[in-house]
């Protein structure tokens, strides 16, 4: 009976987290989410403009190998073949692991008083903007929009949401309010961890 009661309690806690606690937490941190999304979108614009006015910028950001491979795929009429160039299982785990790591860094870098999270969001936004403009410049905008956003909408959203979790944690150190700095950090870190846990089904 004791084991059964514990199982029911655990299941109830699980349901409460997903149905009540997480939605309320996301609502209470919508300001940080808006800031994270704003940083990312500004970075996308910066990346696109930089690629427009500096033809070598995309190579600087993405690397010569990636750009050359994409150009070769475009010549072959398969501009988005980069997402299918690996065996399906390897590609899946490679993409998933990379998204998890970027999202984790976006959150963990909040320990650097939120500035680390800003850096991760800026870096990834600039990469996306530069690569998107590069594909536009090559005349494959339509294919790139389908390929990148069909493949990456959830992943990009996860990075932004994880970034908001990093801002929640970092801001708790910068702005403790009526709490001690340590107590505020603990509260902020716990909120951030819960937000990141909410992303697990998306990976």
Tell what function each PLM region has.
Residues 1-5, 60-68, 154:
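Short, non-transmembrane cytosolic segments of multipass membrane proteins
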Residues 15-30, 81-82, 90, 182-187:
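Cytosolic juxtamembrane amphipathic/interface segments immediately preceding
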Residues 1-15:
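Soluble N-terminal domains of membrane-associated systems
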Residues 24-42:
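Alpha-helical transmembrane segments and their helix-start/interface "positive-inside/aromatic belt" motifs
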Residues 49-73, 123:
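Interfacial/capping segments of alpha-helical transmembrane domains
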Residues 129-201:
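Hydrophobic alpha-helical transmembrane segments and adjacent short intramembrane/lumenal linkers
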Residues 43-47, 117-137:
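Small-polar-interrupted transmembrane alpha-helices in polytopic inner-membrane proteins
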Residues 84-116:
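Individual transmembrane alpha-helix segments
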